[in-house]
Amino acid sequence: MADPEVAAAGIVKKRTFKKFSFRGVDLDALLDMSTDDLVKLFPSRIRRRFSRGLTRKPMALIKKLRKAKIEAPAGEKPAAVRTHLRNMIIVPEMIGSVIGVYNGKTFNQVEIKPEMIGHYLAEFSISYKPVKHGRPGVGATNSSRFIPLK
């Protein structure tokens, strides 16, 4: 709760938000960075992926994302772009986009945030239904002998 003295004085503390940085580099610098400089900041698995080259499919997705951002009205979210590319690595250019990531059954809408840089799209669209464990069945353990049968 607020202190009564502060409330009486009418002083409102301005909220400060943490400025995002990826490996010590702020977001504006990341957006202006060349691909070669950006790759140096990524972990080894992703550096290897970029060193082996981007194929046609990821480039087509980035092209569609650019188009959706351009066509979106100012201050609005861009239209969702659907994709099956779960192995696509999130780069700074994709921030602010909405992507429908296929999980094998449906397209889960994911809004790309700065904290997602360097992760795969698949990490944000779960492809399985987590197990909800029920009661143990007959023969599960010795103690289950005393559970009455239905």
Curated annotation (Swiss-Prot):
- Main localization is cytoplasm
One GO cellular component term of this record is: cytosolic small ribosomal subunit
Read off the SUPFAM superfamilies from this record: Ribosomal protein S19 (SSF54570)
Q: Where in the cell is it found?
A: Cytoplasm
What keyword terms does UniProt attach to this protein?
A: Cytoplasm, Ribonucleoprotein, Ribosomal protein
Task: Check the record and name the PROSITE patterns matching this protein.
Answer: RIBOSOMAL_S19
Q: What is any Pfam family matched here?
A: Ribosomal_S19
InterPro entries recorded: Ribosomal_uS19 (IPR002222), Ribosomal_uS19_CS (IPR020934), Ribosomal_uS19_euk/arc (IPR005713), Ribosomal_uS19_SF (IPR023575)
Query: What Gene Ontology terms describe what this protein does at the molecular function level?
Result: RNA binding; structural constituent of ribosome
Q: Which GO terms describe its biological process?
A: translation
State the family named in the UniProt similarity comment for this chain.
Belongs to the universal ribosomal protein uS19 family.
Q: Which HAMAP family match?
A: Ribosomal_uS19 (MF_00531)
Name by which UniProt lists this protein = Small ribosomal subunit protein uS19y
Protein's organism: Arabidopsis thaliana (Mouse-ear cress)
